[in-house]
C-alpha cells in the first residue's frame, strides 16, 4: 500500500546471487533477485546425494523414486542399499506417527491425545509423545509436570538424548532447583560433548542467575564454560551472543586487541544473523584489518555482500584468496561503489586468472557495460567465442551497441544470429515475444501466433514461455481455433503451473477458480498439511526436532551444523530456507527457497528439480504464517482468504516488522497516513501498525474499501491497494482496453503491473496447492 512506482531492480550476477540477507525492501520479492536473472547462481556445490533422496521420497507413493535415483548414480553399492533402506524406514516411520500428526495443533488441543501415548508401550512413539508433552508443559509454566515425563527418557530416545537432558535442566531451573540444573547441564556436557544441546548447557553454566533476566553483565558462574562454548561451538547463536557480550565488557587495556580480534573474527564468520553484525564487521576492518588473513577477508567480503554493502564487499574481496567468485565480486563491488577504473581492472584480471570460469562470462558482460562502444564490441566478440551459453545475451548487447553506433544492418544481423544460432536462449525468447506482441497489436494474429509458437517450442522453460503460451491461446481464439487455444492454455498449466498465466489460462478453460470480477466472493476449500516431511539434509537430531515442530531448537541445531553458508548445497539451502520460515525469518526464508532456481550446473539443476517436484517445496514457497489472524479477518471482511494471504505475501513476505523505504508498515504495508484515515472510519484510535493484529485489521478494511470502490472487481481493487484509487480511476478513464488482460498489460506503473501479476499469481499458487479439487484438475492434465 505504497502508491508509488518502485525503483527498477539492480542487476545482479550469479556470483552475486548467493542467498542474500534482505533486511527490508520497498517491495520485497522472493521470486526475483535484487539484480538481473541473466547471471545465474554459480555456487560451488558439494554433492549431498543421500539427504536429497530423503526429501524426494516424502510419501509412500514416491518411495520407489529413491531406488530409481540411486540407480542413476555412478556407484549403487551395498552400503547405498543399506542407506536407502534406512531412509525409507525413516520416511515410513514419520508418515505413520500419530504424534507427528499433532504438530500443527495448539498445545492445549493435543494434550489429550499425547497423554495416553506417553503412558503407553515403550517405543519411538512413546518417546516422542513424552518429549512433546514435556516441552508443552514447560512452555505453559508447568515444569513440575514435565520432569516425570523426562525422567529416564534420555536412555531410550536416542535421536534427542542430549535435548532430553537440556529440557530436564530447563525444568529444574524454572522450579528454582539450580543445583540440580547445574548437575544436569554438567552431565550433558560430559555425555554429549559434540551435541548442539551442549552449547546451550555451556551458555547456562557460564551465566550467573542474577544476569539471566538482565542485559547487565555480571561475574560468570564458570568462566571456562563460555570459553569452551566459543572454542567448540563457534557458529552457535549463543556463541555469537557471548562474543558480543564480552566485547561490550572489555576494559581498555594494552592487550585489548588480543581479546577483541578473535571475538570479532568469530562474529565475522558466523554472526550474520545478529542485529549488530555490521557494526562488528566495520570495527574488525577499521581496527584490525592489518591482522586479517586472505581467508578472513573472504568472510568479511561475504558479510558485507550479504548485508548489501557492495562497495565495502568489493574492497574486502580484493584482499581475499583468489577464486572466481572473490575476483568477480571484487570487480562488481568496485563497480557498484562507483570505482569504474578499478572495476575494469579487476574484470580484466578475472578474465586472465580464470579464463574458463562461469563467473568470467558474467564479468565480461559487465565489463562491456563499462567500456566505450568499440572496446565493448571486442569484449563481447571474445565472450561469444569462448562462452557459448552466454552468447545469446552477448549478441543482444552487441546489437544494442550497433544500434547506438548507427549500424542498423549489423544490429539486425546480430539479432538474426541469436535466432538461428542460439534459438533456446533468453535473448531469442525476448526477440520472439516482442515480434509476437508487435504483430498482435497490428491485428496480424497469424504472424503473432507463429512467433509465439516459435518461442514456446524453442525455449519452453524460459520465463516468457508462460506469457507467450497464454497469449498464443488468446490469439488462436481470435482466429476461431478453439482446440488449438485449449491445447495452448493446458500446456501453460502443465509447463508453468506456478505462473500467473496458468491462472489466466485456467479461466479460459472455464475452471472454477475465480476471475477478476468473481474472485472476492469465491470461497475455496482449503486443506492444509497435517504433518511435516523430512528435510533434505541435516543430522538425525535436526530431523527429529523439525518433525516435532520445535522450530527454535531446530534452528539453533542447524546453525551449529551449517558452517558453510558461503557455499551451500542445494539441499542445505532448501533446509536453511525452511528452518528460517519456522522461526519467523520469512523474508529471508522465502528468498532462500525461491533462489534455488538460479542454480546452473547440471547436477544442481537435477537436485533442484527433484526438490521442486515435491509438495514441500511449494508449501515452503507459499506458506501460511499467521493463519488464524489472516483467515479470520478475511472472513470478517467477506474476502477470499487466499487472495488476502497472497496479498500479504507480496506486501511483506509475512515479515511483521518490515518497513518500506517510504514508510509503509507491517504485514499489509499500511502507510501511517492511511492508518490514521482508517482509524477515523472504523472508530479505533488505539492501534499500533507494527502489531500484526492491528495491521491486518486495517489492511483488510482497506482492501475491502478498494473492492467497494470498484464494484468488487478485484483487479482494480488490488491495483488500487498498490497505486492508489486515484491512479487506477485515471487509468480506467484513459486506457483503451476491451478486457481485463489488456488492462493489465497497459498499466503504466511497472511496479503496479508486476504487483497485480504477483498477487494473483500468488493467489493461484495457494489455490492449486491447498484446494484439493484444483490440484486434482491440474494432475489430470
Functional labels for PLM-detected ranges:
Residues 117-126, 140, 153-162, 188-200, ...:
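Short solvent-exposed coil/turn linkers within tandem alpha-helical repeat scaffolds
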Residues 95, 130, 165, 202, ...:
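TPR repeat positional signature
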Residues 48-52, 60-135, 139-141, 147-148, ...:
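N-terminal leader/linker segments that initiate helical-solenoid repeat arrays
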Residues 102, 137, 172, 209, ...:
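Residue at a conserved register position within TPR or TPR-like alpha-solenoid repeats
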Residues 382, 396, 405, 438, ...:
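Catalytic glycan-binding domains that act on GlcNAc-containing polysaccharides
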Residues 106, 141, 176, 213, ...:
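Residue-level detector of the short coil/turn that links helix A to helix B
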Amino acid at each position: 500500500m505504497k502508491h508509488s512506482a518502485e525503483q527498477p531492480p539492480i542487476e545482479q550476477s550469479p556470483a552475486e546471487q548467493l542467498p542474500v540477507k534482505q533486511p527490508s525492501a520497498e517491495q520485497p520479492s522472493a521470486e526475483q533477485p535484487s539484480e538481473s536473472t541473466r547471471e545465474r547462481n554459480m555456487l560451488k556445490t558439494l554433492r549431498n546425494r543421500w539427504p536429497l533422496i530423503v526429501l524426494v521420497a516424502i510419501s509412500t507413493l514416491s518411495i520407489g523414486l529413491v531406488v530409481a535415483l540411486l540407480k542413476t548414480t555412478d556407484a549403487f553399492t551395498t552400503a547405498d542399499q543399506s542407506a536407502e533402506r534406512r531412509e525409507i524406514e525413516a520416511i515410513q516411520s514419520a508418515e505413520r506417527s500419530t504424534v507427528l500428526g499433532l504438530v500443527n495443533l495448539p498445545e492445549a488441543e493435543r494434550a489429550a491425545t499425547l497423554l495416553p501415548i506417553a503412558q503407553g508401550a515403550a517405543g519411538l512413539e512413546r518417546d516422542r509423545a513424552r518429549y512433546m508433552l514435556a516441552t508443552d508443559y514447560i512452555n505453559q509454566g508447568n515444569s513440575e509436570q514435565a520432569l516425570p515425563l523426562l525422567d529416564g527418557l534420555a536412555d531410550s530416545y536416542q535421536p534427542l538424548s542430549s535435548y532430553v537432558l537440556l529440557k530436564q535442566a530447563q525444568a529444574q531451573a524454572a522450579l528454582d532447583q539450580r543445583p540440580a540444573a547445574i548437575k544436569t547441564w554438567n552431565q550433558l556436557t560430559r555425555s554429549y560433548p559434540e551435541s548442539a544441546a551442549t552449547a546451550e548447557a555451556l551458555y547456562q553454566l557460564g551465566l550467573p542467575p542474577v544476569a539471566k533476566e538482565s542485559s547487565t553483565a555480571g561475574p560468570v558462574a564458570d568462566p571456562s564454560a563460555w570459553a569452551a562454548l566459543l572454542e567448540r561451538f563457534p557458529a552457535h547463536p549463543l556463541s555469537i551472543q557471548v562474543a558480543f557480550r564480552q566485547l561490550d565488557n572489555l576494559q581498555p587495556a594494552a592487550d585489548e586487541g588480543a581479546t577483541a580480534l578473535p571475538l570479532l573474527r568469530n562474529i565475522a564468520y558466523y554472526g550474520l544473523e545478529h542485529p549488530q553484525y555490521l557494526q562488528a564487521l566495520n570495527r574488525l576492518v577499521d581496527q584490525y584489518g592489518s591482522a586479517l588473513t586472505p581467508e578472513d577477508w573472504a568472510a568479511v567480503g561475504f558479510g558485507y555482500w550479504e548485508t548489501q554493502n557492495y562497495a565495502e564487499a568489493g574492497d574486502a574481496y580484493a584482499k581475499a584468496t583468489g577464486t572466481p567468485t572473490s575476483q568477480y565480486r571484487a570487480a562488481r563491488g568496485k563497480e557498484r561503489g562507483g570505482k569504474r577504473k578499478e572495476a575494469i581492472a579487476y574484470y580484466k584480471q578475472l578474465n586472465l586468472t580464470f579464463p574458463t570460469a562461469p563467473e568470467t562470462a558474467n564479468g565480461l558482460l559487465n565489463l562491456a557495460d563499462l567500456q566505450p562502444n568499440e572496446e565493448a564490441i571486442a569484449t563481447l566478440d571474445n565472450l561469444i567465442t569462448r562462452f557459448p551459453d552466454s552468447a545469446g545475451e552477448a549478441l543482444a548487447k552487441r546489437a544494442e551497441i550497433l544500434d547506438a553506433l548507427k549500424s542498423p544492418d549489423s544490429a539486425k544481423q546480430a539479432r538474426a544470429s541469436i535466432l538461428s544460432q542460439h534459438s533456446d536462449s533468453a535473448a531469442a525468447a525476448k526477440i520472439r515475444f516482442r515480434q509476437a506482441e508487435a504483430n498482435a497489436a497490428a491485428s496480424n494474429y497469424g504472424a503473432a501466433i507463429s512467433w509465439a509458437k516459435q518461442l514456446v517450442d524453442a525455449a519452453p522453460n524460459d520465463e516468457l514461455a508462460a506469457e507467450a503460451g497464454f497469449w498464443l491461446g488468446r490469439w488462436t481464439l481470435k482466429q476461431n481455433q478453439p482446440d488449438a487455444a485449449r491445447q495452448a492454455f493446458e500446456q501453460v498449466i502443465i509447463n508453468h503451473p506456478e505462473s500467473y498465466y496458468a491462472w489466466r489460462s485456467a479461466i479460459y478453460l472455464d475452471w472454477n477458480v475465480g476471475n477478476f470480477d468473481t474472485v472476492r466472493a469465491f470461497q475455496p476449500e482449503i486443506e492444509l498439511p497435517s504433518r511435516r516431511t523430512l528435510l533434505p539434509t541435516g543430522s538425525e537430531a535436526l530431523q527429529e526436532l523439525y518433525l516435532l515442530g520445535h522450530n527454535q531448537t531446530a534452528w539453533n541445531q542447524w546453525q551449529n551444523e551449517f558452517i558453510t553458508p558461503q557455499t551451500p548445497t542445494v539441499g542445505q539451502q532448501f533446509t536453511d530456507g525452511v528452518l528460517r520460515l519456522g522461526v519467523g525469518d520469512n523474508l529471508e526464508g522465502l528468498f532462500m527457497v525461491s533462489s534455488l532456481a538460479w542454480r546452473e550446473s547440471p547436477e544442481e539443476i537435477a537436485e533442484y528439480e527433484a526438490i521442486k517436484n515435491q509438495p514441500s517445496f511449494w508449501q515452503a514457497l507459499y506458506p501460511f504464517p499467521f493463519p488464524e489472524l489472516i483467515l479470520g479477518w478475511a472472513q470478517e471482511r467477506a474476502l477470499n482468504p487466499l487472495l488476502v494471504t497472497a496479498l500479504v505475501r507480496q506486501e511483506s513476505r509475512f515479515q511483521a516488522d518490515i518497513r518500506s523505504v517510504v514508510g509503509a508498515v507491517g504485514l499489509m504495508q499500511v502507510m501511517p497516513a492511511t492508518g490514521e484515515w482508517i482509524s477515523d472510519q472504523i472508530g479505533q484510535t488505539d492501534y499500533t501498525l507494527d502489531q500484526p493484529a492491528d495491521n491486518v485489521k486495517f489492511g483488510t478494511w482497506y482492501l475491502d474499501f478498494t473492492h467497494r470502490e470498484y464494484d468488487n472487481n478485484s483487479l482494480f481493487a488490488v491495483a488500487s491497494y498498490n497505486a492508489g484509487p486515484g491512479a487506477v480511476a485515471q487509468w480506467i478513464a484513459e486506457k483503451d482496453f476491451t478486457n481485463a488482460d489488456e488492462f493489465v498489460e497497459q498499466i503504466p506503473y511497472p511496479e503496479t503491473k508486476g504487483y497485480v501479476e504477483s498477487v494473483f499469481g500468488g493467489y493461484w499458487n495457494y489455490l492449486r496447492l491447498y484446494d484439493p479439487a484444483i490440484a486434482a484438475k491440474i494432475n489430470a492434465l
